[in-house]
């Protein structure tokens, strides 16, 4: 019975096949007729080379992300010692052996490879190992891996946000999403994505709780979605709706191939609650924690030194920024500019501040859009366009009445939409002591609505092609 042994991956850094390849190259460069030597049969094929019985583990390289079957330098030394002991000749260590820096830090399963069949079987596990490591690197916010994912121009990035009740953290009050299909856009010659035109987005309010359950400690703003019309959805149908959005963007599940979908989150709390809601995510989907990614960028000095928008003090290492405060750091003069860091022009800074002020936080739709937009700014701030926001015209009140046959409606109502109920802002309430507001009284010099009750609700200037 074979024994199961775990070893520390530190020191296991020499690709086994590269050891054999390096020796064949060394013999050729130095004109060594190895095939005429008494020990030459050890190098006649890779299978003969494996007969030495090599101790190996599988790891992934921390820089390239590729998976390798690696051995230790001491094992190479033992092979050279065996040749000298048996055949009386000293074979030097070959140069140019591929060295790997293991990404894994936990113990690995030690295996003994003695023939090509064992090596081939172990080699077949490398794609799954590489995928598992890549998912871990992206989830941890490793900048190199995340930048590679973005530069592939073939993934779909989906940002989601939930607003939960403060009284019952299992009650979802709102859900919003924003997505960009990079592969689709790149095939149309559109790169980088233009947030205002290329983001697919939506905002849903749970009908059972609308205007009934309201958070007090962290006030939410369900009626102030800035990028379109909100929709009312029942509590029982929300998981089905979310599942349909994910299914429309994801590729098939696989143990060896990464999914085309990358889910953006800000922390991992919502993912756990999605499981409780019965929402299944394919195992090969990548999860990118934007907060961890930004913290890593700041820790390594890529973002320079800055003021924390929350405290107005120099930012401390390890601190986490909310999506809107993350965007504010792009609109503030940095305390120190890092090498290669892009700083927005004053005009773009003013445009970004206007966008942030027009999109109230703790609205699930706004937060999802800002999460995706802030992540794109971290990845490509120099070429990312800032969305232009203008006040949204007031619409009809929410209607939850069931759809009726068109023939049974009066002629004056045949133009009504039969789609899902749209939740635009309720009519503005007039104060008991105030006079009727004229339209010009509702617009300030900065083109924003006065904050009267829930009536302030900015919207997007123009719609475009979704990615």
What role is predicted for each listed range?
Residues 413-467:
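Extreme C-terminal disordered tails of eukaryotic proteins encode short linear targeting/docking signals used
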Residues 2-115, 187, 195-200, 205-214, ...:
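Metal-dependent phosphoesterase core characteristic of DEDDh/y 3'-5' exonuclease domains
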């Amino acid at each position: 019975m074979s024994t199961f042994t775990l070893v520390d991956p530190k020191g296991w850094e020499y690709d086994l096949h590269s050891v054999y390849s390096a020796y064949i190259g060394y013999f050729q460069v130095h004109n060594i007729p190895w095939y005429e030597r008494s020990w030459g049969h050890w190098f006649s094929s890779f299978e003969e080379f494996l007969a030495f019985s090599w101790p190996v583990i599988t790891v992934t390289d921390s820089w390239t992300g590729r998976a390798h079957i690696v051995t230790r330098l001491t094992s190479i030394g033992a092979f050279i010692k065996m040749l000298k002991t048996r055949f009386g000749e000293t074979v030097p260590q070959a140069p140019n052996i591929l060295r790997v820096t293991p990404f894994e830090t936990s113990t690995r399963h030690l295996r003994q490879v003695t023939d090509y069949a064992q090596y081939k079987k172990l080699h077949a596990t490398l794609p799954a190992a590489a995928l598992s490591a890549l998912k871990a690197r992206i989830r941890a916010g490793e900048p190199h891996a995340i930048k590679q994912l973005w530069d592939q121009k073939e993934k779909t990035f989906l940002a989601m946000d939930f607003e939960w009740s403060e009284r019952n953290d299992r009650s979802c009050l709102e859900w919003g999403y924003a997505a960009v299909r990079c592969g689709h856009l790149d095939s149309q010659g559109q790169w980088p994505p233009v947030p205002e035109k290329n983001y697919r987005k939506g905002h849903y309010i749970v009908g059972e709780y609308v205007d009934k359950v309201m958070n007090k400690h962290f006030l939410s703003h369900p009626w102030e979605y800035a990028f379109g019309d909100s929709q009312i959805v029942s509590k029982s149908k929300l998981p089905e709706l979310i599942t349909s959005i994910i299914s429309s963007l994801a590729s098939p599940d696989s143990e060896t191939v990464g999914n085309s979908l990358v889910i953006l989150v800000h922390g991992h709390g919502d993912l756990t609650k999605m499981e409780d809601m019965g929402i299944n995510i394919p195992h090969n989907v990548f999860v990118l924690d934007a907060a961890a990614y930004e913290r890593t960028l700041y820790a390594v000095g890529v973002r320079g030194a800055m003021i924390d928008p929350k405290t107005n003090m120099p930012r401390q290492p390890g601190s986490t920024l909310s999506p809107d405060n993350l965007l504010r750091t792009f609109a503030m003069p940095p305390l120190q500019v890092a090498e290669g860091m892009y700083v927005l022009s004053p005009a773009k800074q003013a445009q970004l501040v206007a966008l942030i002020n027009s999109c109230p936080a703790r609205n699930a739709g706004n937060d999802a859009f800002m999460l995706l937009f802030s992540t794109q700014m971290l990845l490509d701030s120099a070429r990312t366009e800032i969305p232009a926001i203008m006040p949204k015209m007031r619409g009809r009140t929410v209607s939850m009445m069931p759809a009726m046959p068109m023939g049974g409606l009066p002629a004056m109502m045949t133009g009504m939409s039969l789609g899902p109920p749209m939740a635009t802002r309720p009519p503005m309430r007039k104060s008991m002591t105030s006079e009727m507001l004229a339209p010009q009284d509702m617009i300030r010099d900065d083109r924003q609505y006065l904050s009267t009750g829930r009536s302030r609700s900015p919207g997007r200037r123009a719609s475009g092609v979704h990615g």
